[in-house]
Amino acid sequence: MNTAGEGVAQDIIGATKTFCKEHAWVDASKIGCIGASYGGFMTQYLQTVTDIFAAAISHAGISDHTSYWGEGYWGYSYSEVSMANSYPWTDKHLYVEQSPLFNAEKIHTPLLFLHGTDDTNVPVGESIQMFTALKLLGRETAMVLVDGQNHHILEYQKRKQWQNTIFAWFAKWLKGDDTWWKALYDKMPDKKKQSSQVI
């Protein structure tokens, strides 16, 4: 509590490094990072504090605690649970300094954003604003929005596309094979443009 991402990030980084060290068959230069909801936030946050991951995927993650506060299904009550009664006006360290958006310039890991357009838990703007920041910074990033889906991707065909998108992104950045990604998104604008798509 009252650490937002710091404490959890230290645990994940330490565990990942230890696992790689203890398993010689693991290529430590090709580790992927993925998370959804709070895990999506953690995925974004981790990329601001470490470079151990070769690619990352955030599904429905919070990028800015200050903008998320008061929004969505949870709204201000989120701080009652995860922030231990801290608020934007009482704890800048939690709400600003540990929000990925305010540290976007520190991210160099290729980062994919996935989000349902009808998410009532974490508004889709949380992914859009972080994606926009990384595009402005010239980072490797992409965003795929799943039309008509909420916090969870439940429609069968769209879930298949969502899962294939995950596998294709990791194949591109962890295996050096962008064939699958191109097959799914060959019409996606190049990296100098928006690089986002709705499925």
Regions found by a protein language model. Name each.
Residues 1-199:
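Active-site-proximal cap/loop segments of hydrolase catalytic domains
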